[in-house]
C-alpha cells in the first residue's frame, strides 16, 4: 500500500534559511563538483553553507536572500527551491553589498576576500545581460531524493506567475553547458536558448565550457 504525498509551494520563511543556503550552493555547482561559492569562500562544505546562511539573512536584499525564494515542500520537508527578481532592482550592486555585510559579520579579512575573488573571478566571463524588465529566475535546485517528481516545473509555474503579476513580459533562466537535464526541464516549461557564452578560463577553473541563457514570453 502506498501513501499519497502532499506537495506545497510556499514562500520561504526564516526557518528555511539553511535550506535556501543549500539551494544556492547546489544551484551554483550545477552538475559540477564545485561552484562559485565553493571556490570563492573556500574551506569545507560546512564553511560554504555557513557563509551562505548568513548571506541569506542580510539586511541588504539580493538574489540569494531567503525572502525572494519559493520552496516546494513534500510532506512538510523542504525539497526544492528557486527565486525570482528584476535585475534593475536587485542586480550585482545589491549582491556586493550583501556579501560585504557577510564578510564583516563573520570577520573575513580583506586578504581572504581578495584571494576568494582571484580564485572565482572567471565567472565574469559567462555573465549574461538581461533585457530591461525581464523576470530573472535563479538558484534552482532539488534535493536528490526528491528529483523526478515535477517539483521544478511546479516551482517555475509559480515563479513565472509572480513575474507576470509584477508586470514582466519575459523571463530568463540560465544553465551551465553540460547540465542537460536542467536545460530539458526549462525547455519543457517553455524556455528556449537565446544566448550562449563560452570562456576558456572559466572552463579551466570550473569545468564547464560556459553557460546558456534561456528565455520565454510571459
Regions found by a protein language model. Give the residues of each.
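Conserved acetyl-CoA-binding loop-helix of GNAT-fold acetyltransferases
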Residues: 148-161, 184-188
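Conserved GNAT-fold acetyl-CoA-binding loop/helix
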Residues: 30-56, 98, 102-111
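Active-site rim helix/loop that mediates acceptor-substrate recognition in acyltransferases
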Residues: 42-69, 73-74, 121-127
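Conserved acyl-donor/pantetheine-binding loop and adjacent beta-alpha core of acyl/acetyltransferases
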Residues: 88-134
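Conserved beta-strand in the GNAT
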Residues: 71, 77-85, 136, 141
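Conserved GNAT acetyl-CoA-binding A-motif
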Residues: 134-135, 163-174
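C-terminal "cap" of GNAT-fold acetyltransferases
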Residues: 169-172, 176-183, 189, 199-218
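A short beta-loop-alpha structural element at the N-terminal edge
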Residues: 8-22, 29-35, 87
Amino acid at each position: 500500500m502506498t501513501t499519497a504525498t502532499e506537495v506545497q509551494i510556499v514562500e520561504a520563511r526564516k526557518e528555511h534559511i539553511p535550506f535556501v543556503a543549500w539551494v544556492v550552493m547546489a544551484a551554483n555547482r550545477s552538475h559540477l563538483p564545485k561552484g562559485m561559492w565553493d571556490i570563492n569562500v573556500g574551506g569545507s562544505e560546512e564553511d560554504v553553507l555557513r557563509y551562505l546562511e548568513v548571506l541569506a539573512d542580510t539586511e541588504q536584499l539580493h538574489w540569494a536572500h531567503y525572502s525572494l525564494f519559493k520552496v516546494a515542500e513534500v510532506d512538510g520537508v523542504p525539497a526544492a527551491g528557486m527565486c525570482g527578481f528584476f535585475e534593475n532592482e536587485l542586480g550585482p550592486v545589491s549582491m556586493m553589498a550583501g556579501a560585504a555585510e557577510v564578510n564583516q559579520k563573520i570577520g573575513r579579512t580583506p586578504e581572504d576576500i581578495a584571494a576568494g575573488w582571484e580564485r572565482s573571478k572567471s565567472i565574469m566571463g559567462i555573465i549574461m545581460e538581461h533585457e530591461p524588465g525581464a523576470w530573472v529566475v535563479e538558484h534552482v535546485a532539488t534535493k536528490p531524493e526528491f528529483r523526478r517528481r515535477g517539483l521544478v516545473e511546479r516551482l517555475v509555474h509559480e515563479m513565472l506567475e509572480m513575474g507576470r503579476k509584477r508586470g514582466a513580459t519575459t523571463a530568463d533562466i540560465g544553465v551551465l553547458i553540460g547540465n542537460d537535464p536542467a536545460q530539458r526541464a526549462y525547455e519543457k516549461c517553455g524556455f528556449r536558448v537565446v544566448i550562449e557564452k563560452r570562456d576558456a578560463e572559466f572552463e579551466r577553473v570550473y569545468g564547464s565550457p560556459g553557460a546558456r541563457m534561456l528565455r520565454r514570453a510571459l
